[in-house]
Amino acid sequence: MKATGIVRRVDDLGRIVIPKEIRRTLKIREGDPLEIYTEKDGGVIFRKYSPMGDLQDFAAQICESIGANTGHVAAVSDRDCIIALSGAPKRELLDKPNSQALEKLMESRKNYRYTPGGTRLRATEGSDKYHLGVAAPILCQGDLMGCVMLLLGENDPALAEADQRLAQTVAGFLGKQMES
């Protein structure tokens, strides 16, 4: 682990201020949950917590089912990266950071469907091979948790409204699973 050389004091309420540079680098937003671990030698470790991580295996099974039934690449992301994928090589997309366009789309909490001639939104940073066909935000008690996506290749035709409804249904289901 690399030391950053920043020292912070704990205030009367037990709070520690994490510097803006570190929050920006690690993409820690206001209100994001952090896990706190302690080491035997007295060290304290803070790690970003992804509630979607608890559903990673389940999301992978759903992606396999959607991918098999639609013939398209199916993916589920949390707010930071793709956590489940089916229909594409995992090394290309899995655990890759979400693109800024996808983050902006998720923040709007709106469903998305690509239309021919429209702007192609990439799912991940640095990958031009796939773009969003449909996307539906995963909401849990009003909080944004991630996104369900069907991805298209360069020459794939646009997806139908039924595919968009499928993504919406799966996103709603995953949101309900997180509530329980």
PLM features: residue spans?
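Short glycine-/small-residue motifs
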Residues: 85, 146-147
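Intrinsically disordered, low-complexity terminal regulatory regions
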Residues: 7-85
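Juxtadomain coupling helices with adjacent low-complexity linkers
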Residues: 56-65, 98, 102-103, 149-180
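Short loop/turn motifs at secondary-structure junctions and domain boundaries
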Residues: 1, 28, 65-68, 126-130
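A short, aliphatic-rich beta-strand micro-motif
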Residues: 132-139
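Structured interaction and signal-relay segments at domain junctions
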Residues: 63-125
